[in-house]
Amino acid sequence: MKDRKILNEILSNTINELNLNDKKANIKIKIKPLKRKIASISLTNKTIYINKNILPYLSDEEIRFILAHELLHLKYGKYHINEFEEELLFLFPNKEAILINLINKLHQKK
């Protein structure tokens, strides 16, 4: 399992990259089993949930991608509007490869 300190460092760095510092103090990470998702965010209580069953197999870059994705929901809302996708692609030019790896890991751990 990834050390909570590492997760919080990646979260803090990603918050800075996305210029979400005004929301930084309120964002929490919770690790729990999720049936069909790698991660999700509650926009109401600003909590990112990461799938406990997949977390040990994720690289730091994959965790950064997941956190950025969820934080962009906090920034832009529930839907993947153009600005959401453009900002994610700017941070991760290899976005498609990361997504393929994450989907493969999700299916392997079911």
From Swiss-Prot:
<dbReference type="InterPro" id="IPR008756">
    <property type="entry name" value="Peptidase_M56"/>
</dbReference>
<protein>
    <recommendedName>
        <fullName>Uncharacterized protein MJ1213</fullName>
    </recommendedName>
</protein>
<comment type="similarity">
    <text>To M.jannaschii MJ0123 and A.aeolicus AA15.</text>
</comment>
<dbReference type="Pfam" id="PF05569">
    <property type="entry name" value="Peptidase_M56"/>
</dbReference>
